[in-house]
Amino acid sequence: MGREFIPLFENWANSYDDTVVGRDLQYKEVFRDYDGILDDVVSRSGHKVLEFGVGTGNLTAKLLAAGKAVTGVEPSKAMREIAEAKLPENAVIVDGDFIDFPDPPFSPDTIVSSYAFHHLTNEEKREAVKRYGKMLGKHGKIVFADTVFKNREAFSAAVKKAKENGFLQLAEDLETEHYPTISEMETIFTSEHFSIAFQKHNDFVWVMEAAKL
């Protein structure tokens, strides 16, 4: 369920916010236009939002500032502690992951995530989307920002470029986690009765908006 990556995020928690502002050259392109990406997710969201992979709370903060009701789900204790320290007292962050999580205190009209869905295998992604489809009403939305590739050739080219640039940590990340292609994401969502559209933000990250049919 992506929880195998918790040790990575326990170690990354204290430096994550430095990474997203571009201080780690290996991930500078991954996080280019980070604020704009999060703002795009917020602008596509409804009023009652369930967020997965809260991390240090950057997207959560923007959702709350926009007046949304938000329940956040985050499996890493270290990340939750940082998020809770920076967010308003009324912020609700619970332990859980994309598939195993407590019911939120409201019926969400939007489910969001940023930089996290790739922790799930494609089979787990479909399992998660199936569950979300049961939670959302007609026209309910899933809005995810994450690294996605046009095709497997584009993925291979990204790994090759990372290695040529000496970005070995980035290359290992790409080869270890479960980064999908656009067609794979289309299949996952349409098979669970969602329409889906993609907006590219940088060489890695796209914002995906799926609506329940």
UniProtKB/Swiss-Prot annotation:
It holds the Pfam family Methyltransf_25. S-adenosyl-L-methionine binds at G53, E74, D97. SMART domains: rADc. Disulfide bonds: none annotated. Belongs to the methyltransferase superfamily. YrrT family. This is Uncharacterized methyltransferase BLi02856/BL02021. Could be a S-adenosyl-L-methionine-dependent methyltransferase. InterPro entries: Methyltransf_25 (IPR041698), rRNA_Ade_methylase_Trfase_N (IPR020598), SAM-dependent_MTases_sf (IPR029063), Uncharacterised_MeTfrase_YrrT (IPR023553). GO terms for molecular function: rRNA (adenine-N6,N6-)-dimethyltransferase activity. Gene3D superfamilies: Vaccinia Virus protein VP39. Its EC number is 2.1.1.-. Keywords: Methyltransferase, S-adenosyl-L-methionine, Transferase. It is an enzyme of class 2 (transferase).
